[in-house]
């Protein structure tokens, strides 16, 4: 579907100059002379390059719709991750760079959603929150109040998070995958 330069919004996936780009930021600019334009920042979903481009109202770009499919994470193999299609049981191998830093939160058997463009994986969506066990937590410092102080802890997947003082090693907690913050104790 073609859209004009002024219809571009953050989060849109567009095809431009032979690449697939996810729009991260836009700014509408109306200079004193000349026509208005949209200043667009975008990230290439294939190789991670950044784009900074001006689109005038007369310019058109192709808005891309990605297909989504349910997969299950199986295991890591070096710098690659192996997923299984939940419908066909077919396995697919994807580089860790496609998942980004969130790959540290992948757990065997975890259900994820893959975004595909022309049958090629572009990104992986993990659940927003996961459960993990704390393997190491600093001791509580006397005199700290529970309301404002947090202490560092290391999860069973090696990720460091800040947790409240009452949380100790061996405790199962819920962590937000994308901002790496403690949410609550696991039930």
From Swiss-Prot:
Its main location: cytoplasm. CDD domains: S1_EF-P_repeat_1 (cd04470), S1_EF-P_repeat_2 (cd05794). GO terms for molecular function: translation elongation factor activity. One of its GO terms (biological process) is peptide biosynthetic process. GO terms for cellular component: cytoplasm. Coiled coil: none annotated. The keyword tRNA-binding does not apply. It comes from the Bacteria. It is found in: Cytoplasm. The keyword Protein biosynthesis applies. Keywords: Cytoplasm, Elongation factor, Protein biosynthesis. Pathway: Protein biosynthesis; polypeptide chain elongation. SUPFAM superfamilies: Nucleic acid-binding proteins, Translation proteins SH3-like domain. Belongs to the elongation factor P family. Involved in peptide bond synthesis. Stimulates efficient translation and peptide-bond synthesis on native or reconstituted 70S ribosomes in vitro. Probably functions indirectly by altering the affinity of the ribosome for aminoacyl-tRNA, thus increasing their reactivity as acceptors for peptidyl transferase. HAMAP family: EF_P. This is Elongation factor P. The gene is efp.
